[in-house]
């Protein structure tokens, strides 16, 4: 079965064709990141306009790269939640137009569930497992027992980890997006030269995260370090920041693995391309970790089309009333049953 997936949840416009859930025939992405650099973050209005400019191109290229025509597509799939509403509308409108004009079925999927699926594209993973989703908009620990179904165990109470990277990079005038820049600088830095706090919440928040304090500490502590003559170079700041940003992810994931007895863990989301994070989890002796290929860490439509193959018999197909949502329909437990 050939499925054409579309994702326009944030600032990347993507289309992909996947056969039988795992055989990626094509995966095309158009990034609008250059248009957002001067603003040091994603501007929703600009993102939506860039999607309009790119959507037909990425769909057409995905078909050509897969040596496939629209008539060969058995099912269309699109993310309709969560994300920027203006961005989501472009993908949903395009998918609806294609599906209904060709009289083909359409599935609406959860963007988070698609990220959770991304390691499945290159790994054979047994259920249950713990999925850590880390990006500029999300920092979530979930327990996964089946495709498209996940229970949120912990989330961020303020900034997402990727957002913290961007804000620290902005403070240091390093550029946007901050994640790749800080990751690169950290490799040249001394993580022991300066220290930032590792924030670990307890009690009812034992599996939740907080990154606003780390961001503030980087701003004020760095100024203090510079005054007191510490080696607060950009490289050392980046190395110290990475430790404080990544360690809570590992510690809390391990803590939930021990509590639940689940010893399989997956990483997904844009921050999953971070080299220190991949090494920390990938080399773990505490649990078995499955990593997505680097090309499937950021937003992409291959993960959408792949998940759709497994969801086609589990949820209703979408109709003309398909809408978009900025948030996950049910924060605590998502079963993908209500896609409309």
UniProtKB/Swiss-Prot annotation:
Enzyme Commission number: 2.3.1.234
Pfam families the UniProt entry points to: TsaD
Subcellular location: Cytoplasm
Cofactor stoichiometry and binding remark: Binds 1 Fe(2+) ion per subunit.
SUPFAM superfamilies xrefs: Actin-like ATPase domain
Predominant subcellular localization, coarse grouping: cytoplasm
Reaction(s) this enzyme catalyzes, per UniProt: L-threonylcarbamoyladenylate + adenosine(37) in tRNA = N(6)-L-threonylcarbamoyladenosine(37) in tRNA + AMP + H(+)
UniProt-recorded name of the protein: tRNA N6-adenosine threonylcarbamoyltransferase
EC category: transferase
GO cellular component, one term: cytoplasm
GO molecular function term, any single one: iron ion binding
UniProt binding sites for Fe cation: 111, 115, 299
Residues where substrate binds: 133-137, 166, 179, 183, 274
Family membership: Belongs to the KAE1 / TsaD family.
Gene Ontology biological-process entries: tRNA threonylcarbamoyladenosine modification
Cofactor: Fe(2+)
Gene name, Swiss-Prot/TrEMBL: tsaD
InterPro entries: ATPase_NBD, Gcp-like_dom, KAE1/TsaD, Peptidase_M22_CS, TsaD
Entry function: Required for the formation of a threonylcarbamoyl group on adenosine at position 37 (t(6)A37) in tRNAs that read codons beginning with adenine. Is involved in the transfer of the threonylcarbamoyl moiety of threonylcarbamoyl-AMP (TC-AMP) to the N6 group of A37, together with TsaE and TsaB. TsaD likely plays a direct catalytic role in this reaction.
UniProtKB keywords: Acyltransferase, Cytoplasm, Iron, Metal-binding, Transferase, tRNA processing
């Amino acid at each position: 079965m050939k499925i054409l997936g579309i994702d326009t949840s944030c600032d990347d416009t993507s289309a992909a064709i996947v056969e039988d859930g795992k055989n990626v025939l094509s995966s095309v992405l158009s990034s609008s990141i250059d248009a957002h650099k001067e603003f040091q973050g994603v501007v929703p209005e600009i993102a939506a306009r860039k999607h309009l400019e790119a959507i037909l191109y990425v769909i057409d290229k995905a078909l050509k790269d897969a040596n496939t025509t629209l008539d060969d597509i058995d099912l269309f799939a699109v993310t309709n939640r969560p994300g920027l509403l203006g961005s989501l509308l472009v993908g949903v409108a395009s998918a609806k137009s294609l599906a209904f004009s060709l009289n083909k079925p359409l599935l609406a999927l959860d963007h988070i569930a698609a990220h959770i699926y991304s390691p499945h594209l290159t790994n054979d993973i047994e259920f249950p497992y713990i999925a850590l989703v880390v990006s500029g908009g999300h920092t979530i620990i979930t327990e996964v027992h089946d495709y498209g179904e996940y229970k949120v165990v912990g989330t961020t109470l303020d900034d997402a980890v990727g957002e913290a990277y961007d804000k620290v990079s902005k403070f240091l005038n390093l550029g946007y997006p901050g994640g790749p820049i800080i990751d690169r600088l950290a490799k040249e830095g001394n993580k022991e030269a300066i220290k930032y706090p590792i924030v670990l919440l307890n009690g009812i928040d034992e599996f939740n995260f907080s990154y606003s304090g780390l961001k503030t500490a980087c701003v004020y502590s760095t100024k203090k370090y510079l005054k007191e003559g510490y080696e607060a170079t950009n490289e050392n700041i980046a190395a110290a920041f990475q430790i404080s940003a990544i360690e809570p992810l590992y510690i809390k994931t391990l803590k939930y693995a021990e509590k639940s007895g689940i010893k399989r863990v997956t990483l997904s989301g844009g921050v999953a391309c971070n080299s220190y994070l991949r090494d920390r989890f990938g080399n773990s002796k505490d649990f078995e970790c499955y990593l997505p290929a680097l090309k499937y860490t950021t937003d992409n439509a291959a993960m959408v089309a792949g998940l759709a193959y497994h969801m086609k018999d589990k949820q209703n197909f979408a109709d003309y009333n398909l809408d978009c949502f900025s948030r996950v329909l049910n924060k605590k437990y998502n079963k993908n049953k209500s896609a409309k």
